[in-house]
Amino acid sequence: MYNIFIAPILNGHQFVFTMCLWYVVPLFMIEVLNILIRKILKLKIENVNEYVFFIVSLLSGMLGTYLASKGYNKGWYLFLDRILYFIPFFSLGILYNKKLEKSDKLNNTIYFTIIFLIQLLIITINGKPVTCTPSWCNFNGNVIMPFIVGTLGIAFWLRIAQILEPIVRNSRVVNIISENTFSIMVHQFLGFFAVNTIFAICSKFVPAISNFNWHRYKTDIWYYYLPNDIKQWYIIYLIAGIIVPLIISYILEKLKDKITNNLIQNNKLFNKRLDKENVV
C-alpha cells in the first residue's frame, strides 16, 4: 500500500521500470494550484498580470531551491521542493503562450548567439557547467541559477523545434513518435531491458558474449551490455527504447478501443431492454 499511495508522492522511484513518472504527481499538484490561485485572484482582480504572476512563481521556486540547498530535500520536503521548483517553469510556459510568443521573432543567428554567450559566461563564472537533478532536488549554484540555465535550455530547444517543424511536420515517423512521447518516456527502460534480455539469452549459446553479467542484469537497471565494449551498441538500446514503448502504446490503445466499444454496445443493449420493459 505504501508503494502505491505514499511512495509516488515522496519519491516516485519505487518501481524502477516506470521511475520516469516521478514528476507526474508534482505536475498534477502544480496544475491544481495554478487553477485554484487564479480562481481566487479573479475574485479580486479581473485580469491577472502574467508578468507579476511569473515573478511571484519565480520567488516561490527560489524558496524551493533554497530549502533543497539547506538539506531539506528528503521525504515530504522533497515533494514540496519539486512543486516549488516546477512552478516558475509552468508559469513561464503560460507567460510565453499568452504574451511572449507573438514577439518571438528574433533572427536565429542573434538568438543562438545570445544563448551561447550567456551560457558561456555562466560556465566561466561557475568554473564548470551548472548541473541540476530536479528528481531529487539537487542543485548547483545559487538559488536562481537552476532557473536561468533551465530557461536557456528551454529557449534553445524551443527555437530548434521551430526550425525543424516545417521540415518534419508531414513525417509519419516523427508524428508517430510525437504522439507517443509520454509512452516512450514511461516505458523506455522496458525497451532497454528487452535488449539486455536478448543478450542474456544469447550469452548461453554465443561464446563471444559469454561475459554477459547476469548479476547486474538482475539487479542493476543501469546495466547495458556492450559487446566488446563498443559504444555504438548504445544505438540498439536507443531504438528499442522507442520501439518497445510504441508497441505498448499500440496494444493499450487497441485494448482501450475494444473495452470502450464493448461498453457502448452493452449500454445500447441495456437501453433497448429498458425501452422494451417501458413499452410493456
PLM segments and residue spans:
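Alpha-helical transmembrane segments and their immediate juxtamembrane cytosolic regions
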Residues: 1-280
